[in-house]
């Protein structure tokens, strides 16, 4: 019963669409009607500005971290914290509060890693930041970090200092997270191939922006 309650709490926590509510409450703007129509960090940055975008990213990330830490704080050892964190990701992608139309899982997934394997989170964050600096594309940077996560998982002996050891649950959850992130970025991948992906005002690739209207 405790585990089911934790899963429900994590899912509902993940279902909170931070960018959407910030837009409606403070800007009287529905993110679904502007930019890409997504309620995640990137579109929030683009439509509502840096402050709203930063808050959205931090809150969405902390949803995952909090979900992972809940069973640890409560002393519940019958279930892996990763499983609880995973349901926060599911809530973020398929939120009950907004008709099961949510974000792309990146920030909340990052939060899950932060709560469970902080050094690994820092490593992938550096990969994300470097890729973003080189390409100015958040979508490509997110996909790259996700794929690098899989590669490093497959080559564990080379990065053993980042992880305590092989964990079947961690491996399974990470693989699913990567697949979800790639699936949720299908449209972005198509725009990247056509050189039409939206850029952000950061990094080296700022002169080729051709945003989707």
Curated annotation (Swiss-Prot):
Its annotated pathway reads: Lipid metabolism; phospholipid metabolism
Transmembrane residues, as ranges?
3-23, 54-76, 83-100, 110-130, 142-162, 163-183
Question: Which keywords does this chain's UniProt record carry?
Answer: Cell membrane, Lipid biosynthesis, Lipid metabolism, Membrane, Phospholipid biosynthesis, Phospholipid metabolism, Transferase, Transmembrane, Transmembrane helix
Q: Which reaction does it catalyse?
A: an acyl phosphate + sn-glycerol 3-phosphate = a 1-acyl-sn-glycero-3-phosphate + phosphate
A GO-annotated cellular component: plasma membrane
| Endoplasmic reticulum listed as a keyword | no
**Cellular localisation:** Cell membrane
User: How does this chain sit within the bilayer?
Assistant: Multi-pass membrane protein
UniProt record similarity statement: Belongs to the PlsY family.
Protein name, entry field:
Glycerol-3-phosphate acyltransferase
Gene from which this protein is expressed: plsY
């Amino acid at each position: 019963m405790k585990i089911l309650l934790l899963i429900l709490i994590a899912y509902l926590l993940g279902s909170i669409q931070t960018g959407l509510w910030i837009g409606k409450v403070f800007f009287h703007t529905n993110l679904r009607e502007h930019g890409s129509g997504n309620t995640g960090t990137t579109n929030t940055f683009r439509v509502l500005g840096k402050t709203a975008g930063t808050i959205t990213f931090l809150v969405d990330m902390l949803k995952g971290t909090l979900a992972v830490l809940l069973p640890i704080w409560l002393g519940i050892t019958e279930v892996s914290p990763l499983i609880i964190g995973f349901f926060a990701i599911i809530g973020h992608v398929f939120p009950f509060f907004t008709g099961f139309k949510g974000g792309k899982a990146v920030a909340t997934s990052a939060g899950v890693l932060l709560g469970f394997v902080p050094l690994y989170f820092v490593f992938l964050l550096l990969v994300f930041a470097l890729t973003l600096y080189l390409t100015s594309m958040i979508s490509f940077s997110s996909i790259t970090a996700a794929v690098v996560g899989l590669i490093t998982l497959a080559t564990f002996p080379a990065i053993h200092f980042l992880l305590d050891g092989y964990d079947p649950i961690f491996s399974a959850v990470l693989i699913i997270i990567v697949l979800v992130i790639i699936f949720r970025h299908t449209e972005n991948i198509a725009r990247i191939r056509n050189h039409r992906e939206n850029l952000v005002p950061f990094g080296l690739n700022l002169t080729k922006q051709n945003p989707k209207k």
